[in-house]
Amino acid sequence: MAEQRQNLASLDSSIIDRLPAYSATLFDAKTQKRLTFESIAAHLGRSEVAVAAIFYGQARASPEDAEKLSRLLGLSAESPIAAQMMGFPDRGRAGPMPPVEPLIYRLYEVVQNYGYAFKAVMNEKLGDGIMSAICFNSKVEKEVDETGAAWVVITLKGKWLPFSRF
């Protein structure tokens, strides 16, 4: 029986100049240790998406996250990386707009094509407001249909924030 190769996400060198300096170190250690975001998330007690966001500098690590992640990746206790991961993120600058990476562009295209439809349905169900991306969580799952085709299921769960009247 053939050995199944593990898929590992790595850092795209074309965006490295848009990311925090620690991102490259985290990705290098992740690759050397052959760790998936799923396995790192299990170790940290966080979601895969949240952990990946820390690697890309789009989410802030808690002191516990930074300690566990540094230990798991074998980073020096004297390294400034833990403190950097706990700093305030500069969100939304990781890639160009519109996106050029095909998968990210497809997600952008989903919002372009269905954004107003999502908004209309949310407004009908919840009233005038917005979905929080702060009080938020997300997960990515794989489903296989009856024909054997793989499908991706992306869940975006955000707190509903009604607009206030003033």
Curated annotation (Swiss-Prot):
GO biological process: cyanate metabolic process
Lyase in keyword set: yes
E.C. code: 4.2.1.104
Catalytic residues identified in the record: 106, 109, 132
Domain of life of the source: Eukaryota
Any one GO molecular-function label of the UniProt entry: cyanate hydratase activity
Keywords: Lyase
InterPro entries the UniProt entry points to: Cyanase, Cyanate_lyase_C, Cyanate_lyase_C_sf, CYNS_N, Lambda_DNA-bd_dom_sf
Pfam family, one: CYNS_N
Chemical reaction(s) catalysed: cyanate + hydrogencarbonate + 3 H(+) = NH4(+) + 2 CO2
Record bears the keyword Lyase: yes
Class of this enzyme: lyase
Annotated family: Belongs to the cyanase family.
Function, as annotated: Catalyzes the reaction of cyanate with bicarbonate to produce ammonia and carbon dioxide.
Protein name listed in UniProt: Cyanate hydratase
Native species: Chaetomium globosum
Classification lineage: Eukaryota, Fungi, Dikarya, Ascomycota, Pezizomycotina
The encoding gene: CYN1
